[in-house]
Curated annotation (Swiss-Prot):
One of its GO terms (molecular function) is unfolded protein binding. ATP binds at residues 30-33, 51, 87-91, 415, 495. It comes from Shewanella sp. (strain W3-18-1). This is Chaperonin GroEL. It comes from the Bacteria. InterPro entries: Chaperonin_Cpn60_CS, Cpn60/GroEL, Cpn60/GroEL/TCP-1, GroEL-like_apical_dom_sf, GROEL-like_equatorial_sf, TCP-1-like_intermed_sf. It is found in: Cytoplasm. Its EC number is 5.6.1.7. HAMAP family: CH60. One of its GO terms (biological process) is protein refolding.
């Protein structure tokens, strides 16, 4: 085992604070509408230009082991905020730096670190309760656009496109962000349920100009097995011929004689039919077939539940307003399933998402829920160069996370105002002793730090801006975008409550632990000078000083 170096007391805290400051100073220049960019060197490809706090934090590794420990702990703050709310990483870093700096000063002055931490924790619990009281629901499309715009660094086009996407696919819908081919951002919305399976034979195509199959008011047959014998399908096809309606078959596979007969009947116009493979594999396929059944009001024909294809009737089939099948995708639009059953299925999938521990499973469940609840929207980010594309895509993703957080827990006045108002309300918090009281004061001072940093990045005097905002009341705050004061809600400067809450909680949690540090242990760096080679006939000479 390698030898370790141990540093105690103030020496340890000074080194740790130096690491905290290096990381936080690199991150906090990005805060606010006039925040600057940070350029990150990549081992391959072009450098990455970003205004995303967590991206900057993740890149930082320091040479000094003790300084690096401080930096890594603050990096954890940014990562946690990003995982929980998807945004607010820079705010969390600024808060953590402010609490650690003030806290370590107090420890150096002889105060009890544990009491300081208790005071900070009490202040944060009270602040979170006040934040929730201050929060307002984010109901309309305009508020959603404003939240997205602020998070995307005041880019209104991103705010608009996210609001439109949410309006079209609903709050439970899936919105994904991709790199586009054009110069402008584009929104692609797939309404209804789409899955990635195309027609089994090109002879089903009835719209040659688009190379697709379109069925109006079709029946939908769902089968959880391979169909190779046409005899099994005859009762359904005979019943169908009398109605004159088209049929979509979704099965594990349709092959051989069965597929050939369907194609011939389709080409002769006896029955309008199209067949596609069921989406997914194994248990996921069974679940997705059940989703389609609930959406269309049909039944999955599966032998394991005692249903045979030969005995199926038209009552077992689902129906939809329209089905469009291309080479790669099948889209079922306006299934005729019962709304109550669809909602029950959505809440069941929601429960599975909460219980799942795998990110992959969560993503797939989220997609299934979206397809049942409304649809899927794809935002294609447009830019002139690859460097700009990556930077813009990161901003769109941040804005999307912020919007989701706003819909979940509501919004508070932005620009650091919410924390300042909350701090003024909990100034008289009751504590047990003077050291705890000072812990509360540290937390209250730290809550001003985001506002001060926004002002500094905008080229203003932080103290002047902070005092002006503190002298105001309610939603009154500083708009760094155009250097004016006024009602933040009216100016459309909103922050999601969840983002502000998570930033404060995670910053206080880790900063509180750092204040109570008394010793640090790290490996002693090895002197890796190579041994000297030996001269003729001699052995090596070992490392020389």
């Amino acid at each position: 085992m390698a030898a370790k170096e141990v540093v105690f007391g103030n020496d340890a805290r000074v080194k740790m604070l130096a690491g905290v400051n290096i990381l936080a100073n690199a991150v906090k220049v990005t805060l606010g509408p006039k925040g600057r960019n940070v350029v990150l060197d990549k081992s391959f490809g072009s450098p990455l230009i970003t205004k995303d706090g967590v991206s900057v934090a993740k890149e930082i590794e320091l040479e000094d082991k003790f300084e690096n420990m401080g930096a890594q702990m603050v990096k954890e703050v940014a990562s946690k905020a990003n995982d929980a709310a998807g945004d607010g990483t820079t705010t969390a870093t600024v808060l953590a730096q402010a609490i650690v700096t003030e806290g370590l000063k107090a420890v150096a002055a002889g105060m009890n670190p544990m009491d300081l931490k208790r005071g900070i924790d009490k202040a944060v619990i009270a602040a979170v309760a006040e934040l929730k009281a201050l929060s307002q629901p984010c109901a309309d499309s305009k508020a959603i656009a404003q939240v997205a715009t602020i998070s995307a660094n005041s880019d209104e086009s991103i705010g608009e496109i996210i609001a439109t996407a949410m309006e079209k696919v609903g709050k439970e819908g899936v919105i994904t962000v991709e790199e586009g081919q054009a110069l402008e951002n584009e929104l692609d919305v797939v309404e209804g349920m789409q899955f990635d399976r195309g027609y089994l034979s090109p002879y089903f195509i009835n719209k040659p100009e688009t190379g697709s199959v379109e069925l109006d008011h079709p029946f939908v047959l769902l089968v959880d097995k391979k169909i190779s014998n046409i005899r099994e399908l005859l009762p359904i096809l005979e019943g169908l011929a009398k109605t004159g309606k088209p049929l979509l078959i979704v099965a594990e596979d349709v092959e051989g004689e069965a597929l050939a007969t369907l194609v011939v009947n389709n080409m002769r116009g006896i029955v309008k039919v199209a067949a596609v493979k069921a989406p997914g594999f194994g248990d996921r396929r069974k679940a997705m077939l059940q989703d389609v059944a609930i959406l269309t009001g049909g039944t999955v024909i599966a032998e394991e539940i005692g249903l045979e294809l030969e005995k199926a009737t038209l009552e077992d089939l689902g129906t939809a307003k329209r089905v469009v099948i291309t080479k790669d995708n099948t889209t079922i639009i306006d299934g005729n399933g019962e709304q109550a059953q669809i909602e029950a299925r959505v809440s069941q999938i929601k429960q599975q998402i909460e219980e799942s521990t795998s990110d992959y499973d969560k993503e797939k469940l989220q997609e299934r829920m979206a397809k049942l609840a409304g649809g899927v929207a794809v935002i294609k980010v447009g830019a002139a160069t690859e460097v700009e594309m990556k930077e813009k895509k990161a901003r769109v993703e941040d804005a999307l996370h912020a919007t989701r957080a706003a819909v979940e827990e509501g919004v508070v006045p932005g620009g650091g105002v919410a924390l300042v108002r909350v701090a003024s309300k909990i100034a008289e918090l009751e504590v047990l002793n003077e050291d705890q009281k000072h812990g509360v004061v540290i937390a209250l001072r730290a809550m001003e730090a985001p506002l001060r940093q926004i002002a500094t990045n905008a080229g203003e005097e932080a103290s002047v801006v902070a005092n002006t905002v503190k002298n105001g009341s309610g939603n009154y705050g500083y708009n760094a975008g155009n250097d004016t004061y006024g009602d933040m809600l009216e100016m459309g400067i909103l922050d999601p409550t969840k983002v502000t809450r998570c930033a404060l909680q995670f910053a206080a949690s880790i900063a509180g632990l750092m204040i109570t540090t008394e010793a640090m242990v790290a490996e002693i760096p090895q002197n890796s000078a190579p041994d000297m080679g030996g001269m003729g006939g001699m052995g090596g000479m070992g490392g020389m000083m």
